[in-house]
């Protein structure tokens, strides 16, 4: 047999190394090594919440907006601060905008490189969202800027239509990969992969389901909590999160093409989904997780959880993060 592996690891930030053991055209085993610095939250202990929040953007380059909003919501929950409906709407839009930017980047980098030049329009739109809504990125008790929220959101939703349309030549369900803009080389590769159905994926992560959330929180309170954040499971069973999991709560992914289509579907439906969120007659009051100091948000790569405990000086006593990558690259997870 032979082995092949990626070289994603960085000496400073770590990474995920996937080693594939194969014999001719059959994969015999997949080994996953995660060297990401999962104990980074130790830096937050005994620091004031304002300082911790200020550290978020520099510590987390990928999905930095998601990390910051998850942190804000966790701290607000721990401090008993209520997130108003307008702040929730603005933050949800920023989460949505960052997720879309990351998904489009993945699409044009990996599947449709001929559209790479159009990525700039999505980046510009995200920056516009940030400019219009950054008033919501402070603790809710200190926020002033809600008055013009609704018109700004309406305008951003209209702009998104023009941004997404040129990127996606086919929005029809079941369109061929070539019609969707997938490059010829990738189409051939996916056709070849289609002859070898994949095994069952890991179970679907759904932390809005109280049973899964409670099992996760119980593990975060156990002695091995730090290791759990590195290799999380639901009661010992690996789970998958991301665009495939969001759309296929009961189904399982047998073909790589199915997963590619789930990413494409989320991008094509983005304008419609943003519009329906914004045009709800009444902003719903934030539901949260119902657990003090805990927040769960959706990012491009999947579900992100922050859990914080504050001491009586309003400093961080304990901080825990479980990122989507740790679910999706569990040594016994879907990739295995």
Regions found by a protein language model. Name each.
Residues 304-306:
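A short beta-strand signature within small-molecule sensing/ligand-binding domains used
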């Amino acid at each position: 047999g032979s082995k092949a592996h990626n070289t994603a690891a960085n000496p400073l930030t770590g990474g995920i190394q996937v080693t594939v053991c194969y014999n001719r055209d059959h994969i015999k085993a997949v080994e996953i090594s995660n060297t990401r610095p999962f104990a980074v939250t130790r830096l937050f202990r005994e620091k004031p919440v304002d300082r911790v929040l200020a550290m978020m953007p520099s510590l987390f380059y990928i999905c930095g907006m998601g990390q910051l909003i998850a942190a804000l919501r966790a701290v607000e929950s721990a401090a008993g601060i209520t997130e108003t409906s307008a702040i929730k709407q603005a933050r949800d839009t920023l989460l949505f905008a960052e997720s879309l930017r990351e998904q489009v980047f993945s699409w044009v980098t990996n599947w449709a490189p001929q559209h790479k030049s159009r990525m700039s329009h999505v980046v510009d739109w995200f920056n516009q969202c940030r400019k219009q809504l950054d008033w919501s990125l402070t603790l809710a008790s200190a926020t002033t800027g809600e008055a013009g929220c609704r018109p700004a959101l309406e305008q951003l939703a209209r702009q998104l239509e023009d941004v997404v349309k040129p990127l996606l030549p086919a929005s029809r369900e079941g369109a061929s990969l070539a019609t969707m803009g997938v490059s010829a080389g990738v189409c051939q590769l996916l056709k070849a992969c289609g002859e070898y159905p994949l095994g069952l994926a890991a179970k679907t992560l759904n932390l809005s389901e109280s049973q899964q959330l409670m099992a996760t929180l119980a593990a975060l309170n156990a002695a091995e909590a730090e290791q759990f954040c590195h290799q999380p499971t639901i009661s010992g069973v690996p789970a998958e999160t991301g665009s495939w999991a969001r759309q296929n709560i009961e189904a399982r992914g047998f073909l790589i093409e199915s997963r590619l289509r789930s990413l494409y579907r989320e991008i094509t439906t983005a304008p419609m989904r943003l519009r329906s969120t914004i045009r709800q007659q009444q902003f719903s009051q934030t539901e949260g997780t119902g657990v003090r100091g805990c927040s769960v948000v959706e990012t491009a790569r999947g579900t992100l959880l922050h859990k914080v405990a504050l001491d009586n000086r309003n400093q961080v006593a304990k901080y825990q993060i479980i990122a989507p990558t740790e679910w999706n690259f569990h040594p016994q997870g879907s990739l295995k």
